[in-house]
Amino acid sequence: MKVPRVIIAGTNSGVGKTTTTLAVISALKNKGLKVKPYKVGPDYIDPQFHSLLAGATSDNLDLWMIPRERIFQLLADASTSFNISVIEGVMGLLDGFGSTDEGSTLDLARITGTPIILVIDGYGLSGSAAAIVKGFKDFSGDLLAGVIVTRVSGERHYDLIKKAIEDNTNVRVLGYIEKNDEVRLESRHLGLVQASELNSFSDYIERLSKVTHINVDGIIEIARASRDLDPKFSPLLSRVGYAKIAVAYDSAFDFYYEENFRVLRNLGAELVFFSPLNNEIPPEDTDGLYIGGGYPEVFAKKLAYAVDARENIAKLIKKGVPTLAECGGYMYLTRTIVGQDGIEYPGVGIVPAKTFLTDKLILGYREIVSKTSNMLLRHGETARGHEFHRSTIQFQDKVDHPFVLKYKDRFEEDGYYSNNVVASYVHIHFLSNIAIPKRFVEECIRYSKKREIS
């Protein structure tokens, strides 16, 4: 199966991968191509930018959370509706688990036969750029098909870098992005700001286009040389019945995996999005609640003033609506949240705890082992996901945590569970254990039937 595709990888984090990926997507769209974006790894923020620009959801390709056959399936899905796929890498090209390249962008490129375009930072470089590219070429071989240079001072500077690389490495240099602070994406305590928070994303893309000078035809040629895919298709899951699941989605809650939404829909769920931040309430006939991660600590004051949203969510949960809350959603369900301003604000009040920020970033892959048989997992069953926060939850009542999280060197209890609520700091990827979304939808269907009878 022909699926033209290319990976935009970096020498390291902060080199301009996301900016370059957006520049490439924009240039391909301007050629009239339909672009399918992807992100290597567990990131929730970069895909928002991809999706907004491409007009198509950006899927995560994560070799640790997602079984390999599903990775091939996700890539093959692009063959029917898109002309080309652009995959943004994660961290540096070879950065994987520990000191190995397992799970890295290069690992994904090898497994899927996808050519790599390497992004290097040209600031303060000329001939030395060749040594950088040669080193990466030694590790990646023929998969390294091109280079794009960021933070270039002008055409003459670019010509020096281009000649040095092409004369010494036989790797094509496909263009550059000028050094310009106006196209640098801002950051906050958990990474880049969200796409929804840029004042005008279209203006940003226009500014980026003006300082981007890339060989689009060369990128298309490289993408078309990708190895053919031979995915083993199997249905993600067949429909189990209808349920209406209300999903909290706004600037405070938008750390979700698009693949999770797709699986829920395949099972028969109708997803209805609402904004707690804007004091929107879930529909009265809601059969389930899904409250994902995000930045409730940044918007704690506004969430506190959104009284209708908080009270209606609490009311639905107390009525027995099956509820899945992850990270920021877990924080929101607590009694109080200490915001970034240090002030304590009311949360939904379901979880008997207080949330506050710390200076410590907790980040990484997690394997969940269930200590209980609950709505999502049976005792001893596992799932995989990602943890990403600077907050901690301090329980005010004694609770039995439903999960044990496996770290590299230790185990730690996590989460909150009641009859109809499962909450955890971990963003679970449903493709790591497809029993989870199936059970969630089935619980929602059971609740729907009980609600209709009453």
Swiss-Prot record:
Q: Might you give the EC number(s) for this enzyme?
A: 6.3.5.11
* Pathway as given in its UniProt record: Cofactor biosynthesis; adenosylcobalamin biosynthesis; cob(II)yrinate a,c-diamide from sirohydrochlorin (anaerobic route): step 10/10
The top EC class, named as a word, is ligase
Cofactor(s) needed for function = Mg(2+)
Q: Which Gene3D superfamilies match?
A: 3.40.50.880, P-loop containing nucleotide triphosphate hydrolases (3.40.50.300)
Q: Which reaction does it catalyse?
A: cob(II)yrinate + 2 L-glutamine + 2 ATP + 2 H2O = cob(II)yrinate a,c diamide + 2 L-glutamate + 2 ADP + 2 phosphate + 2 H(+)
Which Gene Ontology terms cover its molecular function? ATP binding; cobyrinic acid a,c-diamide synthase activity
Tell me which residues are marked as the site Increases nucleophilicity of active site Cys.
Answer: H427
Locate the GATase cobBQ-type domain: which residues? 244-435
SUPFAM superfamilies this protein is in? Class I glutamine amidotransferase-like, P-loop containing nucleoside triphosphate hydrolases
The active-site annotation reads C327
Give the record's GO biological process terms: cobalamin biosynthetic process
Q: Does the keyword Ribonucleoprotein apply?
A: no
- Please provide the record's keywords in A-Z order: ATP-binding, Cobalamin biosynthesis, Glutamine amidotransferase, Ligase, Magnesium, Nucleotide-binding
Annotated coiled-coil segments of the chain: none
Instruction: Cite the PANTHER family for this sequence.
Output: COBYRINATE A,C-DIAMIDE SYNTHASE (PTHR43873:SF1)
| Role of this protein | Catalyzes the ATP-dependent amidation of the two carboxylate groups at positions a and c of cobyrinate, using either L-glutamine or ammonia as the nitrogen source.
State the remark under miscellaneous: The a and c carboxylates of cobyrinate are activated for nucleophilic attack via formation of a phosphorylated intermediate by ATP. CbiA catalyzes first the amidation of the c-carboxylate, and then that of the a-carboxylate.
Q: What is known of its domains?
A: Comprises of two domains. The C-terminal domain contains the binding site for glutamine and catalyzes the hydrolysis of this substrate to glutamate and ammonia. The N-terminal domain is anticipated to bind ATP and cobyrinate and catalyzes the ultimate synthesis of the diamide product. The ammonia produced via the glutaminase domain is probably translocated to the adjacent domain via a molecular tunnel, where it reacts with an activated intermediate.
Output the NCBIfam families linked to this UniProt entry: cobB, PRK01077.1
Give the family, as the similarity comment puts it: Belongs to the CobB/CbiA family.
Tell me the protein's name. Cobyrinate a,c-diamide synthase
Q: Which gene encodes it?
A: cbiA
